[in-house]
Amino acid sequence: MRDHVVAVDIGTGSARAGVFTSRGALLGKGEHPIIMNRPRENHAEHDSENIWAAVCTAVRAAVTASGVDVAVIGAIGFDATCSLVVRDTEGKPLTVSTGGEDRFDTIVWLDHRALAEADFCTATKHQVLEHSGHFMSPEMEMPKLMWLKKHLPQSWAKAGYFFDLADFMTWKATGSLARSRCTLTAKWNYLAHRQPGWQTDFLNVIGLGDLRERGNLPEETTPVGESVGTLTAQAAEALGLDRECHVGAGMIDAYAGALGTLGGHAGDLDALEHQLALIAGTSSCIVSFSRERKRSTGMWGPYYEAVFPDAWLVEAGQSATGALLDYIVGMHAAGGEPTAALHDRIVKRIAELRAVEGDAFAERIHVLPDFHGNRSPLADPHAVGVVSGLTLDASFDGLCRLYWRTSIGVALGIRHILEKMHDYGYVPDTLHVAGGHVKNAVLMELYSDITGCKVVVPKMNEAVLLGTAIAASVSCGLYDSLGAAGAAMYPGGHERLPDKRKKTIYDRDYRRFLAMYRHRAELESME
């Protein structure tokens, strides 16, 4: 019986794979790094063939580690960052790089080369922007495509296929040109609640009237949990699987994480409205679901059926969180390469210093964490970070103080987002956290104490892989819905309640946080 699935998660720096049972048990994992090219500031590029090779290596390793026979694997699912893959009319790599190398055919999600194009889209005030928080982020695909057409016209002229990275993976696996409703709705300004979903007038206004024809983009989308086909002979051989293995519609990595963290509530939309998924690693993403469409200024969405049927999804986030802490560690005189061991050492020392100094520890340092722009709730990709309260202290303890207060700034940013969501009618009271941040005791404490929310950490910290596995299990018929699959496969979680004794302290920090935003705006407006 084919009662196992393979889940693949393609992140910024590696491809990971896991083999799951139909009850959500992870039997084996594999991981392989992927390369990134950084030819200029704000430019980041992948080689999609390198990614495919990394995926194949990771899948083979996971299957070997699991000890299962490939004949029991019913489906493989892919999630990925919202990176843009460009292929020519023959399906071969086509350069997106100013360096001209064809192998670099993928603009990475975090690439901000298209700031001007994003601003142009925002200035149109087109109705599609009502579903992206009334602004366009350079991390969306339309600005990236506009940049490509303007700055690399030779690549645009040769283009035959445009893919979100997750859709590229399902194409490589099956040969199907189907696109996921998850990817197109969230990153391509496709309106799944309308017919037609593509808004031709918007494409014409931004100079992409030929996009669908040029990129082989279909009119209809494939919902999460549906199969787009079975593996081709070539893909089956490369992955070490067989041709009867189904391939589920692709997912954006953060939304796969939301499905994995909120899976236990997936069958009850009313309960789901009180839950938030916080997928926190290099950056942080908050995902919320609701039965009714609600205001979303400063956030991405609302997107119809991006994950669950008949549900609206809204996404908020911070463009650099784990990356910001890495930066603080790397730039400080007492820091260095931001390894996991160094982060652990800093976190341990912070606990020691707090035990001695109490609530006064580093209290005069204040940080606005917008070092890579403010995704939410200000929707300002041009925003910059601010640090107040520095001295000449270059010691390791000085680094720990700055790290602590930067972590507070990150958590205050989450509170800022949640308060805006409450203003818009969202009713979350529980944060389900997944990703690298769950390994950081400082952040996990602050997320609860600063937001006032109950924090839940899944018992298995592989929420993104699990979410992809849940969707894959539906695509091969193990379950008839995402709700049924989530109820069966979600492992439960550990809860942490906020320390009410800290409320006064962090309320004051939040007032200072908002004051710093006002002061930054005042400084930047001076002539």
Task: Give the ranges of each region predicted by the language model.
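ATP-dependent carbohydrate kinase catalytic cores
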Residues: A192-P309, A320, V442, Y447
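Glycine-rich phosphate-binding/hydrolytic loop that grips phosphoryl groups
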Residues: D119, I252, A256-T261, Q318-G322, ...
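N-terminal glycine/serine-rich phosphate-binding loop of ATP-dependent small-molecule kinases
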Residues: M1-V96, E130, K158, A233-E237, ...
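A short helix-loop
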Residues: H131, K149-L152, W171, G175-S176, ...
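Phosphate/pyrophosphate-binding loops at sites that engage ATP/ADP/AMP, CoA/4′-phosphopantetheine
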Residues: V55-G74, L152-W156, F202-R214, E237-L239, ...
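Acidic, glycine/GT-rich loop-and beta-edge segments that sit at the periphery of enzyme/chaperone cores
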Residues: E139, A323-D326, G330-A334, C476-E527
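Gly/Ser/Thr-rich active-site cleft segment
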Residues: I10-T12, R23, F78, K125-I252, ...
